[in-house]
């Protein structure tokens, strides 16, 4: 049987504005990947959507149904995701001790961190399993010959630990043609959003829109539990030789509490407006709430809740 691993990164070590860098890997059997591709293609077809899934681009909730349906589907599949957080300040301290540049350190991380993430996905595979690794296109990977290094490292791991799996290929591909790369990008984007508490910035329309999507995903059926089971979140720092497994529920819990408090205030405000001006069109209430036209799904969710139909009745 063939197994596939998809790798992506967010916030680079040498980007001075970011405190943390993130590396993510998604792993699943080829059968699950094929089902995932088919399902997402069907969702795109039903919605007449040709856009890629990228969390950074989710700034208008006219794509709400697409993101909601795709991510809800993914959370219920036999997929595993490993994400590692790197403290950039700790990394810079290491670079100074080694007397190397942060760019050189990043090249070293490119080999070690993906290897750790991939091994975590591969270690329980059956003997004779064949693995293909797909990396989001990046010209920097070619410069450091990352594909060859990863293949050698992973196969060395398999031999040393007597696992029996074999990495057959490591290739760069464009996310435009690889739905799993879009999935790891989106889920990692959600995790970064929660870890960095971007939901606290309530003056940003884009972050309010992102928060609404995440909240409605997490309260739907058992998606919260599914996310906790799907994602392993690790952190690297220079204080220990071992990486630390973080409790994802700490981040989702803080988010849900704050978002619920925010929603209560907004729904109460909307309820008063609707009582004062009954039977008006949605645009009227949107303007009274001072929402942009990018927040239509958010408003409809609130109206649905006031009508006792549930937040996700669409």
Role assignments for model-derived ranges:
Residues 2-14:
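Two-metal-ion RNase H-like nuclease active-site motif
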Residues 14-16, 36, 143-144:
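Short helix/loop capping segments that flank catalytic or ligand/cofactor-binding pockets
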Residues 32, 36-58:
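Compact, glycine/acidic-enriched structural inserts
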